[in-house]
Amino acid sequence: MEAPLVSLDEEFEDIRPCCTEDPEEKPQSLYGTSPHHLEDPSLSELENFSSEIISFKSMEDLVNEFDEKLNVCFRNYNAKTENLAPVKNQLQIQEEEETLRDEEVWDALTDNYIPSLSEDWRDPNIEALNGNSSDTEIHEKEEEDEFIEKSENDSGINEEPLLTADQVIEEIEEMMQNSPDPEEEVEVLEEEDGGEISSQADSVLLQEMQALTQTFNNNWSYEGLRHMSGSELTELLDQVEGAIRDFSEELVHQLARRDELEFEKEVKNSFITVLIEVQNKQKEQRELMKKRRKEKGLSLQSSRIEKGNQMPLKRFSMEGISNILQSGIRQTFGSSGADRQYLNTVIPYEKKSSPPSVEDLQMLTNILFAMKEDNEKVPTLLTDYILKVLCPT
């Protein structure tokens, strides 16, 4: 079977306009240099390559000729190939670079491949081509890097050095001096003298702490204690023991004060809780009474209509007499056990310049709790509250 013929005219249609119209003229090289005869006889077979390109040849012939030309090209490694592939000089390279620099299409293609200064190209996770990411993605990545740096700074990577004991004591002293006491704002005028005395005691205690701290800084070292005499050591020991006693007493006082504040907080919370529960129950009772009153009015209206339709047989009946007696007993001796309620009891209260004390809140809490439970102790508790708080003897 014969090999198919290949027509090179169709494949080289784009090259034809570049050729000269005169067939006798020799073709010009790609770079504008005139061709020369090959000096090496081993390369003389390549001169007829351009003329043979136009002819019709089979695939087998083309492959064979290509192999022959390859063998000719690589036969002599010292052969000069400048005539086959002329080397550009520096001027031509510079002109081509300037031409590419002025091309808008080339600039549009190569702008996305410019490396960013903020990117670390040694990072294995970075993309192989920077052109794949748009300007928005690059901006988002820069913002993410800045956020990571801020989070690292906030997380304590650049932590400040730890404070010494002397610095901590100084900060505590400044806090105690600068922080106002919230209790002094709500204290009555009678307790102002006690507040002044306590503030003076605190200032004296602070002075003692400062003096003791200075002594510790000056003498509390191995060398300093070693060069001190026995009397000086004894005096320093007495100072330390006295400071320990004073600080222990102050600590006990502050702990007791903390317990008092916690107890006061619990009493206030319980008072507020019981008060809200009583108010909710009073609201429910009012709604229930309105509902009963409405139902009673409807029943009375219906009974009147029925009585108007019927003629009374007797002027008095046993049922009417019984109802009259029961209503009289209720008005005389009070309501029955089912209707006895202390939920709507009114507690007298006198508003003072100072808030109620813990004892007053405890008594009010007990009264409210008895009202919520509908306990019979409400009158007794209310009497005690009036005699002890409102009208003390």
Curated annotation (Swiss-Prot):
Q: Which UniProt keywords apply?
A: Cell membrane, Coiled coil, Cytoplasm, Cytoskeleton, Membrane, Microtubule, Phosphoprotein, Transport, Ubl conjugation
Q: How is it modified after translation?
A: Phosphorylated by protein kinase C zeta; which enhances interaction with UBE4B and polyubiquitination. Polyubiquitinated in a UBE4B-dependent manner; which does not lead to proteasomal degradation and may be important for neurogenic activity. Polyubiquitin linkage seems to be mainly through Lys-26.
Determine if Oxidoreductase is one of this entry's keywords. no
Pfam families in UniProt: FEZ (PF07763)
Q: Which residues carry this modification: Phosphoserine?
A: 58, 299, 317
Coiled-coil regions, chain positions: 231-299
The organs and tissues expressing this protein are described as: Brain.
Instruction: Name the InterPro entries on file.
Output: FEZ
Where in the cell is the protein located?
Cytoplasm, Cytoskeleton, Microtubule organizing center, Centrosome; Cell membrane
Task: State a single Gene Ontology molecular function.
Answer: gamma-tubulin binding
Q: Where is this region: Disordered?
A: 1-41, 130-154
Q: Which domain of life is it from?
A: Eukaryota
UniProt function note: May be involved in axonal outgrowth as component of the network of molecules that regulate cellular morphology and axon guidance machinery. May participate in the transport of mitochondria and other cargos along microtubules.
What subunit structure does UniProt give?
Answer: Homodimer. Interacts with UBE4B and SAP30L. Interacts with SCOC and ULK1; SCOC interferes with ULK1-binding to FEZ1. Directly interacts with SCOC and UVRAG. Stabilizes the interaction between SCOC and UVRAG during amino acid starvation. Interacts with the NH2-terminal variable region (V1) of PKC zeta and weakly with that of PKC epsilon.
Provide the protein name: Fasciculation and elongation protein zeta-1
Query: From which organism does this entry originate?
Result: Rattus norvegicus (Rat)
Q: Lineage in the entry? A: Eukaryota, Metazoa, Chordata, Craniata, Vertebrata
Q: Which gene encodes it?
A: Fez1
